[in-house]
């Protein structure tokens, strides 16, 4: 499956669903019917949530869990959009199967750091968002980093499963540690420049790493930043960025109603603290990378 293509389709689906659930369902169903193999667990979940009745919703979940052997984080199957299935015996059976698979995956999952050795003068470390993985991060950032050979692109993948094939970050004192440890391990490898880029929750992990550990970099790029760390630690964050002389670049879609306020808040406090910071608001863009990539 092509997770990047799927993410774009699902973002469009969300935009339509804000005004019309049936229309959003038809759009996503058409996308699925055009290319079933390119869409995965999230598409089936969205189709179940948008379905016009519990029978159709249950069938999508049956296809995902029973036929495709996928699974979801337990909380996901407790969504209000699936409330009509809450006491359905067939649904509860599927959920039990999914929950068991999640528990098995979580018990053996570990963080993955792709770096093996120095292969270029500069290094770019990409951090995925929730319901993503290291491969998605690499595909998202490759057009931005480029293929000139000037930058070596590496990734960190969370240890916490989100669903089948995807991972998530928690906003606590533990989840960010693989990011911090990876950043620290690179600092004495002889790179001319080290840049880090995060998408959504990945931005929060980078800010926590810079703030609560010795980790540092030359450039920090935050795309569509979902950054709860600002709620209690905004002063600590900008102090760390300033003291470590990190260039901060914040980019967010003009239509990203959840993340744009936080992006603007971070820009304001960083600017006030004297940080080298810039904010780019990307027109006609929601919670996603822009159609036309920018460059490091």
Locate each region found by the language model.
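Alpha-helical segment of the N-proximal tetratricopeptide repeat
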Residues: 3-30, 34
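TPR/TPR-like alpha-solenoid helical repeat scaffolds
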Residues: 43-51, 71-97
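Short beta-strand-to-loop junctions in surface cap/lid or active-site-entrance loops
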Residues: 108-121
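Serine-hydrolase catalytic machinery in alpha/beta-hydrolase-like enzymes
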Residues: 122-188
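Short beta-strand immediately N-terminal to the catalytic nucleophile in serine-hydrolase-like folds
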Residues: 196-198, 223
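Gly/Ala-rich beta-loop-alpha elbow adjacent to hydrolase catalytic centers
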Residues: 198-206
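A conserved short beta-strand
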Residues: 215-228
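The feature captures the conserved acid-bearing segment of alpha/beta-hydrolase catalytic domains
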Residues: 227-296
């Amino acid at each position: 499956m092509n997770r990047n293509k799927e993410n774009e389709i699902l973002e469009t689906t969300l935009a339509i669903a804000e005004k019309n659930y049936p229309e959003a369902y038809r759009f996503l169903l058409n996308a699925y019917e055009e290319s079933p193999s390119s869409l995965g667990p999230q598409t089936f979940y969205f189709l179940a949530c948008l379905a016009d009745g519990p029978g159709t919703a249950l069938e999508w979940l049956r296809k995902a869990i029973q036929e495709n052997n996928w699974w979801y984080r337990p909380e996901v199957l407790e969504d209000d959009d699936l409330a009509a299935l809450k006491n359905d015996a067939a649904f509860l059976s599927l959920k039990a199967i999914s929950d068991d698979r999640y528990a098995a995956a979580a018990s053996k999952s570990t963080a993955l750091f792709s770096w093996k050795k120095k292969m270029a003068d500069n290094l770019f470390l990409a951090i995925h968002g929730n319901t993503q993985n290291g491969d998605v991060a690499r595909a998202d950032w490759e057009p931005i980093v480029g293929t000139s050979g000037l930058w070596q692109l590496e990734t960190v993948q969370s240890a916490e499963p989100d669903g089948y094939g995807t991972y998530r970050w928690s906003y606590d004192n533990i989840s960010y540690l693989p990011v911090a440890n990876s950043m620290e391990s690179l600092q004495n490898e002889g790179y001319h420049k080290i840049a880090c880029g995060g998408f959504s929750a990945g931005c929060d992990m980078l800010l926590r790493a810079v703030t609560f550990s010795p980790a540092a970099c030359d450039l920090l790029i935050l795309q569509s930043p979902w950054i709860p760390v600002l709620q209690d630690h905004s002063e600590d964050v900008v102090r760390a960025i300033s003291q470590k002389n990190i260039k901060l670049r914040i980019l967010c879609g003009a239509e990203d109603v959840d993340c744009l306020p936080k992006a603007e808040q971070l820009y304001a406090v960083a600017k006030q603290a004297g940080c080298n910071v810039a904010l780019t608001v990307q027109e006609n863009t929601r919670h996603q990378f822009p159609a036309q990539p920018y460059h490091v």
